[in-house]
Amino acid sequence: MVRRLIIGISGASGFQYGVKALELLRAQDVETHLVVSKGAEMARASETAYARDEVYALADFVHPIGNIGACIASGTFKTDGMLVAPCSMRTLASVAHGFGDNLLTRAADVVLKERRRLVLMVRETPLNLAHLDNMKRVTEMGGVVFPPVPAMYRKPQTADDIVAHSVAHALSLFGIDTPDSAEWQGMAD
């Protein structure tokens, strides 16, 4: 089977995480299926210099958020799972409560019901009790809550270094290794 991953980009700050995932996966020859929420489109326009077509060109397939009939909305369409990068608290809540009211949340629901890997790069701070409860629910359902916390031990020089390391670590949870996912070798004596 071809390696195939769904990339969801939802409306939290950090659109760059989704773009970096697409860039790293293209270099790994992984077939990507992209779905972008309306909130994510707003974040792209306000936080980045990326043009929509430039981002969409990084994916093998782009699915409109309203297309509930897309291939990724069915469990018979085999994937390695789904990465939502970034994941808004609205998307987290929808996934935690089984609301598949758009293609992004429907695809996440399908990934969970098929017992495939779902990784949510949640972007919010501070957290309230509803956020924590939703994270707990998703974890109990088999999903992975993965806040993109900077790894300062890597001595990042740029924001892109921080983004690349977080995304590479998230992709390693799917068994996808990238140059940015080097293993920690311990501290020098």
Swiss-Prot record:
Binding site for FMN: G11, A12, S13, S37, S88, M89, R90, T91, R123
EC numbers on record: 2.5.1.129
SUPFAM superfamilies found in the cross-reference section: Homo-oligomeric flavin-containing Cys decarboxylases, HFCD
Catalytic reaction list: dimethylallyl phosphate + FMNH2 = prenylated FMNH2 + phosphate
Pfam families hit by this protein: Flavoprotein
Record's function text: Flavin prenyltransferase that catalyzes the synthesis of the prenylated FMN cofactor (prenyl-FMN) for 4-hydroxy-3-polyprenylbenzoic acid decarboxylase UbiD. The prenyltransferase is metal-independent and links a dimethylallyl moiety from dimethylallyl monophosphate (DMAP) to the flavin N5 and C6 atoms of FMN.
Name of the molecule in the record: Flavin prenyltransferase UbiX
Species this protein is from: Neisseria meningitidis serogroup B (strain ATCC BAA-335 / MC58)
